[in-house]
Curated annotation (Swiss-Prot):
UniProt GO cellular component terms: cytosol
Native source species: Ehrlichia ruminantium (strain Gardel)
Annotated NCBIfam families: argH (TIGR00838)
CDD domains: Argininosuccinate_lyase
Keyword Lyase attributed: yes
Catalysed reactions, semicolon-separated: 2-(N(omega)-L-arginino)succinate = fumarate + L-arginine
Record protein name field: Argininosuccinate lyase
First-listed, main subcellular location of the protein, grouped into a coarse class: cytoplasm
Length: 466
């Protein structure tokens, strides 16, 4: 038996190997809702344009609604013999209402159908991601507000550099997620043109109304070029690029969580409900959620690479290679949402060990930059001169195995005679962070303002999650 939807010019059916490599229903059934929405909009347009009768349109739409209920209740049987979600639905519709079902495919192709389905699916996914990122940002704000003046070491090269506040550090991730969300919003606007009605690649001779379909499905407009419409997968590439940047941000935070809960840091304690144990070492409490976020980052990166390689050599318009766009897309979206949820759960169940953070912030001469700044302001040295002198003072402290503020004024004056006792006022971690009042700096007063701005941002973007 040849394929009932395209077998007219064939004398034999596909063999089992061809069916196996050709089918996509095992994964594109995830698009059933979008495919039915697209078909209903297309059917309404055909009725409006008098290409099919109103009665035929009613039969088709009712049948599609029944099929959707069957799928959602688990009573629909998908068949690999029918290749994909489009043909499974159309064949089921034909069994339900007869040959009238075949009229649904008038003036369209699976090429423009799948492109429309995918755009609808990505729009829905962007809203889900907006919801999850909004929640994660809210969690970061809450912790930052509780620890706007909690002092911790800031790092460069993973070496203690300068004291900062935990609130300021967490607000850095808030800003990263803001950029992530803006990328999703930009993608939504850029991709919101409707391919439906482009047919296989050249458009159609039927008097269709593409603007109606676009409006019915919530698009801003139809696509401008029918060849581009069916061969474009930029929106998938951009989605996966955005996903890669977003998971990279989560991976950086996950790495810090892994470090911070380790014995050598002890900055935080993770809750038992978001950690795991060891099958051999009874004492272990492992940050597996953070490690899995870090690990899944490579998986999402590879999804982006996958689709870029699929698309790089394809001539216009459609090629079957493009069937390979869906699995990496679905996998990346599913794992990114899971990672955002896991990160939110970790942060909501975290204990901050403030004393350990402060102790660490006071180590390794973290206020040396404050000393250099003081020499510039009060001794009228150039920064390069003060940098050299501060380096000598650090070397002296190392030699004496003490902190800078534990050196005596006499010891300091042997290096720079004009230094005064006032210098000790800038050598504490607390005074260091309090002094960093430049816009965007770590001073607690700045952090409170950043948190206030963050709350306004969340209020203004709440509608994007609806």
């Amino acid at each position: 038996m040849t394929n009932p939807l395209w077998g007219g010019r064939f004398t034999t059916s596909s063999n089992d190997i061809m069916k196996k490599i050709n089918e996509s229903i095992s994964f594109d059934q995830a698009l059933y809702e979008e495919d039915i929405l697209t078909s209903i909009a297309h059917c309404k347009m055909l009725v409006n344009q008098k290409i099919i009768s109103k009665y035929e349109g009613q039969l088709i739409i009712h049948g599609l609604e029944v099929i959707q209920k069957q799928i959602e209740s688990g009573n629909f049987e998908f068949s690999t013999d029918l290749e994909d979600i489009h043909m499974n639905i159309e064949y089921s519709l034909k069994k339900m209402i007869g040959n009238i079902a075949g009229k649904l495919h008038t003036a369209r192709s699976r090429n423009d159908q799948i492109a429309t389905d995918l755009k609808l699916w990505i729009r829905k996914s962007i809203k889900k991601l907006e919801q999850q990122l909004h929640k994660l940002q809210s969690t970061l704000l809450n912790i930052a507000e509780n620890h706007y003046d909690t002092i911790m070491p800031g790092f460069t090269h993973l070496q203690i550099a300068q004291p900062v506040t935990l609130g300021h550090h967490l607000m850095a991730y808030f800003e990263m997620l803001k950029r992530d969300r803006s990328r999703w919003q930009d993608l939504y606007k850029r991709m919101n043109q409707c391919p439906a009605g482009s047919a296989a690649l050249a458009g159609t001779s039927f008097p269709i109304d593409r603007h109606f379909i676009a409006q019915e499905l919530g698009f801003d407009s139809p696509t401008e070029n029918s060849i581009d419409a069916v061969s474009d997968r930029d929106y998938i590439i951009e989605f996966l690029s955005n996903a890669s940047i977003c998971i990279m941000h989560l991976s950086r935070l996950a790495e810090e969580i892994i470090l911070w809960c380790s014995y050598n840091f002890k900055f935080i304690t993770l809750s038992d409900n978001i950690t795991t144990g060891s099958s051999i070492m009874p004492q272990k409490k492992n940050p597996d959620a953070a490690e899995l976020i870090r690990g899944k980052t490579g998986r999402i990166f590879s999804s982006l690479n996958h689709i870029l390689i699929v698309m790089k050599g394809l001539p216009l318009a459609y090629s079957k290679d493009m069937q390979e766009d869906k699995e990496p897309l679905f996998d990346a979206e599913r794992n990114l949402i899971l990672c955002i949820e896991a990160m939110n759960s970790m942060l909501n169940n975290i204990t901050i060990n403030s004393e350990n953070m402060l102790k660490a912030a006071e180590h390794d001469y973290s206020t040396a930059t404050d000393l250099a700044d003081w020499l510039v302001k009060h001794i009228n040295l150039s920064f390069r001169e003060s940098h050299e002198i501060t380096g000598q003072i650090v070397k002296l402290a190392e030699h004496n195995k003490c902190k800078i503020h534990e050196l005596t004024l006499i010891q300091l004056q042997k290096i720079i005679p004009s230094i005064t006792e006032d210098v000790f006022s800038v050598l504490s971690a607390k005074n260091s962070v309090t002094s960093r009042t430049s816009y965007g700096g770590t001073a607690p007063i700045n952090v409170l303002q950043a948190i206030k701005n963050g709350r306004i941002y969340l209020e203004n973007t709440d509608s994007l999650t609806q």
